[in-house]
A protein has these predicted regions:
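Alpha/propeptide regions of enzymes that mature by internal proteolysis
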Residues: 2-3, 7-346
Length: 346
């Protein structure tokens, strides 16, 4: 993996996670850029949620579920839990409302669906799936997406359902600091973009605000047939302008899957968009002949400029990989040959 903008050796158990017999593999993330002072209890809560979602995906894969069904299933679970910044628990706009976005992509035929500006849809990732399966389009946003949701009969709730007391407090702090909380995390005025910097003077409940700092979620899967899929969901930036769209719903930027691999990204959205980060992993595999972990390391090092981000990926041969150039990334991964890892730091 990569860290702090430089390439460091990958641990052997993770650098080449290829199942020689093929088979399924899965990775889940809950965001890159973690406060090094994150209290142990918050770390454990995140690991428990990631483990639960990973096991949910593993169970489905063992039951021969398809990759596209598994990524939707896992991300729905992440959206339902308020710990991370997607679905319930999403970051708030400058108006104090929630505008969510998500995307999903099925690798074998490169079908995709994406949504933005959702305010009432309980599970944005499932609406993105319906855009892919039930509409002639790839991307619907704001009132058009909401209308489509009602036509399809998906579960909708009041906007207040998504708002948590922690996020109300964070929005207040962001407004007082006259800034946004970059990727639902740390005021850019007092912290660098991935959690490493001087101690923030802003606190909530006596703790640095970055302890309330999970962000974008995603899942990538290759099933036993070698089919790859990817899904990503987020509430975006705290105190963002209404109408802002990040990388998560943009196919090729925050999410991508093809016959070669599946990728989900997290971090500084504008940098991920400029680097078309998710597609770049597939491109260097296809055109430079790199393996999955090599491709991940390459794009994190060479395609982010000064941006901070991370990503998870799987290949059609059963490899699973991840990389990030900041302090940490909430992640969990497993493969059919018995490998499993749940972690935050390097």
């Amino acid at each position: 993996m990569t860290k702090s903008g430089t390439t460091v050796p990958c641990s052997p158990h993770r650098a080449e996670r290829e199942n020689k017999m093929g088979g399924w593999a899965i990775a889940v993330h809950g965001g890159a850029g973690v406060d090094p002072n994150l209290p142990p209890q918050r770390q454990e809560e995140a690991k428990q949620l990631l483990t639960r979602c990973l096991n949910l995906g593993i169970s489905a894969l063992r039951s021969n579920a398809s990759a596209i069904d598994v990524v939707e299933l896992v991300v729905r679970e992440l959206e339902t839990d308020p710990l991370f910044n997607s679905g319930r628990g999403s970051a708030l706009t400058e108006k104090g409302t929630v505008e969510m976005e998500a995307s999903i992509m099925d690798g074998p035929n490169r079908r995709c669906g994406a949504v933005s500006g959702l305010t009432t849809v309980k599970n944005p990732i499932s609406l993105a799936r319906l855009v892919m399966d039930k509409s002639p389009h790839s991307y619907l946003a704001f009132s058009g997406a909401e209308e489509f949701a009602r036509q399809q009969g998906v579960e909708v709730v009041e906007n207040e359902y998504f708002i948590t007391p922690d996020n109300v407090g964070m929005l207040k702090l962001a407004k007082e600091a006259n800034t946004i909380l970059f990727d639902y995390r740390i005021p850019t005025a007092v912290y660098d973009t991935c959690g490493a910097g001087v101690e923030s003077p802003l606190q909530m409940n006596g703790l640095p605000i970055s302890v309330y700092a999970p962000e974008t979620v995603g899942c990538v899967v290759v099933d036993s047939e070698g089919r790859c899929a990817a899904a990503t969901s987020t509430g975006g930036l705290m105190n963002k302008m209404s109408g802002r769209i990040g990388d998560s719903p943009l196919i090729g930027a925050g999410t991508y899957a093809c016959e070669v691999c599946g990728v989900s990204c997290t971090g500084e959205g504008e940098a991920i968009i400029r680097g078309t980060l998710a597609r770049e992993v597939a491109a260097v595999m296809e055109y430079k002949g790199l393996g999955l972990q090599q491709a991940v390391d390459f794009v994190v090092k060479h395609r982010l400029d000064e941006g901070k981000a991370g990503l998870i990926a799987v290949s059609n041969s059963g490899e699973v990989a991840y990389g990030f150039n900041c302090n940490g990334m909430f992640r969990a991964c497993a493969s059919q040959d018995g490998f499993m890892e749940v972690g935050i730091w390097e």
